[in-house]
């Protein structure tokens, strides 16, 4: 039954991939395509989004484009994954369909590159940006691109910025001017780092077809197998569903992390604390120098094993014929984890938030996408989905040993209370109860206990950011993804309601969400508000679409005096309404940006000239400099608003 539900949801994935709200979402995607690729691409994409699925003659007729323009543009749009294509087995006709999801990710590309640069370094972000601009690319082609080589030259051994490389690579990328041989040495480890984190995947043929076409094609193949002809009825349907899901997974699987993950962590991935500056002082002083030397030797051996063997000197190149593309599903997981960390930072100490970040990063390495289904289930119908369990001992290895965990929580309970009543207890270093190691760091067992205490703080209401489980007698921690995704949606809606209608409306909404449908009298008793204020708030929120009123007649006469009026709060309907408004607002921002650009088109063309760009003070007059500053401020304002609205779309739809 579960497999049948998964297949049914997969078949309807195509409609969900069209962003649910077709009108404003399609308008937004058309603007994004035209903004990034020009008017020709925008015209073809608008035609496909308006008429949904077209063969080549109809697409040519509706778009009114000649073959010399249409065919090369279609090939380029398929390269950019903006258009699906599928050749029917019945009549041999090829049909084209707009890929709304890929078009929408154009608005999130800057945020993704910023995240990758923060995580893996500037050169990794450059490589990912190149792949993103090409749609997909062959490894051998990436080796020939001058921008990747020039980036290595500019960075002068980019290991200072690149989070995956150490001093050894700085020497190999030195100043001898022979950069042509060093570029592949840097490119291949960077590609391996991106693949190990899941940020790039292998391109498969099924990825050029819509999900619905892949489902129908896989089902046709499964039904045509000889062993299926002997089955009938329910057994046949179950076998078809199981075979279809398996074949679909096999055809669409582009995972490149196999062999690049060691003990649940990407090979060569530096622990968060290892990227700190070498001259940064420790939290606590070291005391026993003999023990310090031994510990330093062990740390050096571990770091060499972690970095050099697994990443820094892994000179095995990637397969030259491998074609890769950006894995947006995995990047959504990483961006969602960043939102969870921001949520945690609002109520816990920085030390606890850093422990939570280590947990989420471990989970991210083993999580391929935010949801198993395309559509978000309705409130109350969504089952809980826990992450993979992460052992507490593994987290103890990732948390910075210099991070002071003991002072950010309450005092530890002692197993044996002090028997000297009325006397001041001895200092910890006098009575022998000091739990620190020789170098001022907590001992292993005590450190693990402190991490467990911090995770226990995160598991407390109201957010319940973590969950504790016992697996084979070992303490593990997980994250309840669907619960936290709902929490993010609710917090976003509550923030909007409070900003529009005030804190009184927020109290009413929280009561309705917790209690369900209530009549006005019962709602007034629970919310402790005067009837006059309550009615004003309910009327304003009903006009804004945030609460609804249901009429329940007591008899068949349906008289107003014999009718019960129940107020209720439907977060699912409100989320859809907010998404529609958000798409519309993003479209208006892009349209306004285009209009403002057209007003000063000649001036902007002048500023984009190669001789003027970077030398504005020399070639532009004082009024032109003022106009340029005003334009940049206006552009930053509009694009910043689009990015902020994209955060809301991610919370409401993707996470």
UniProtKB/Swiss-Prot annotation:
InterPro entries: POLR3C_WHD (IPR055207), RNA_pol_III_RPC82-rel_HTH (IPR013197), RNA_pol_III_Rpc82_C (IPR008806), RPC3 (IPR039748), WH-like_DNA-bd_sf (IPR036388), WH_DNA-bd_sf (IPR036390). Belongs to the RNA polymerase beta chain family. It is found in: Nucleus. The gene is rpc82. This is DNA-directed RNA polymerase III subunit rpc3. The lineage of its organism: Eukaryota, Fungi, Dikarya, Ascomycota, Pezizomycotina. Keywords: DNA-directed RNA polymerase, Nucleus, Transcription, Zinc. GO terms for molecular function: single-stranded DNA binding. One of its GO terms (biological process) is DNA-templated transcription. Residues 291-305 have a biased composition (Acidic residues). Component of the RNA polymerase III (Pol III) complex consisting of 17 subunits. Residues 582-603 are annotated as: Leucine-zipper. Residues 405-417 have a biased composition (Polar residues). Signal peptide: none annotated.
């Amino acid at each position: 039954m579960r497999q049948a539900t998964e297949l049914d949801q997969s078949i309807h994935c195509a409609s969900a991939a069209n962003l649910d709200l077709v009108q404003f979402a399609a308008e937004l995607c058309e603007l994004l395509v035209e903004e990034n690729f020009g008017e020709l691409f925008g015209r073809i994409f608008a035609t496909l989004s308006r008429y949904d699925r077209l063969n080549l003659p109809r697409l040519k007729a509706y778009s009114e484009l000649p073959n010399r323009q249409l065919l090369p543009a279609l090939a380029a749009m398929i390269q950019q994954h903006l258009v699906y294509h599928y050749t029917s087995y019945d009549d041999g006709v090829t049909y084209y369909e707009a890929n709304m999801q890929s078009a929408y990710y154009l608005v999130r590309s800057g945020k993704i590159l910023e995240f990758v640069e923060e995580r893996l370094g500037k050169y990794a972000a450059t490589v990912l940006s190149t792949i993103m601009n090409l749609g997909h690319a062959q490894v051998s082609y990436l080796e020939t691109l001058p921008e990747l080589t020039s980036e290595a030259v500019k960075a002068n051994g980019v290991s200072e910025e690149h989070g995956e490389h150490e001093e050894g690579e700085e020497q190999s990328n030195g100043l001898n001017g022979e950069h042509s041989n060093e570029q592949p040495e840097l490119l291949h480890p960077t590609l391996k780092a991106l693949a190990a984190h899941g940020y790039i995947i292998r391109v498969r043929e099924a990825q050029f077809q819509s999900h619905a076409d892949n489902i129908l094609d896989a089902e046709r193949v499964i039904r045509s197998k000889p062993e299926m002809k002997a089955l009938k009825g329910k057994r046949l349907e179950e076998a078809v569903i199981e075979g279809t899901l398996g074949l679909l997974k096999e055809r669409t699987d582009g995972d490149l992390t196999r062999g690049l993950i060691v003990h649940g962590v990407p090979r060569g991935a530096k622990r968060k604390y290892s990227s700190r500056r070498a001259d940064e002082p420790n939290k606590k002083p070291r005391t026993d120098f003999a023990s310090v030397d031994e510990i330093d030797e062990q740390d050096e051996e571990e770091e060499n094993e972690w970095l050099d063997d697994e990443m820094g000197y892994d000179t095995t190149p990637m397969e030259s014929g491998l074609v890769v593309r950006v894995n947006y599903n995995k990047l959504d997981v990483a961006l969602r984890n960043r939102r969870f960390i921001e949520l945690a930072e609002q109520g816990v100490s920085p030390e606890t938030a850093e422990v939570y970040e280590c947990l989420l990063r471990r989970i991210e390495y083993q999580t391929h996408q935010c949801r198993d289904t395309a559509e978000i289930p309705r409130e109350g119908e969504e089952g809980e989905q826990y992450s993979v369990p992460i052992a507490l001992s593994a987290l103890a290895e990732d948390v910075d040993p210099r991070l002071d965990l003991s002072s950010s929580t309450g005092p530890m309970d002692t197993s044996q209370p002090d028997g000297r009543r009325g006397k001041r207890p001895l200092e910890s270093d006098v009575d022998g109860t000091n739990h620190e190691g020789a170098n001022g760091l907590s001992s292993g067992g005590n450190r693990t206990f402190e991490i467990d205490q911090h995770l226990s703080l995160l598991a407390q209401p109201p957010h319940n950011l973590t969950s504790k489980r016992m697996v084979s007698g070992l303490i593990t921690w997980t994250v309840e993804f669907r619960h936290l995704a709902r929490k993010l949606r609710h917090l976003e809606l509550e923030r909007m309601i409070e900003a529009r209608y005030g804190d009184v409306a927020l109290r009413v909404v929280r009561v309705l969400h917790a209690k369900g449908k209530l009549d006005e009298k019962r709602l007034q008793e629970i919310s402790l508000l005067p009837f006059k204020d309550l009615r004003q708030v309910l009327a304003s929120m009903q006009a804004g679409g945030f609460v609804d009123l249901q009429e329940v007649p007591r008899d068949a006469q349906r008289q107003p005096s014999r009718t019960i009026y129940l107020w209720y709060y439907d977060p699912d309907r409100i989320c859809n309404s907010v998404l529609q408004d958000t798409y519309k607002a993003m479209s208006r921002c892009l349209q306004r940006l285009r209009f403002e650009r057209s007003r000063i088109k000649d001036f902007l063309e002048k500023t984009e000239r190669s001789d003027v760009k970077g030398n504005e003070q020399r070639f532009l007059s004082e009024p032109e400099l003022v106009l340029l500053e005003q334009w940049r401020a206006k552009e930053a304002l509009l694009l910043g608003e689009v990015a902020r609205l994209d955060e809301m779309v991610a919370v409401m739809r993707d996470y």
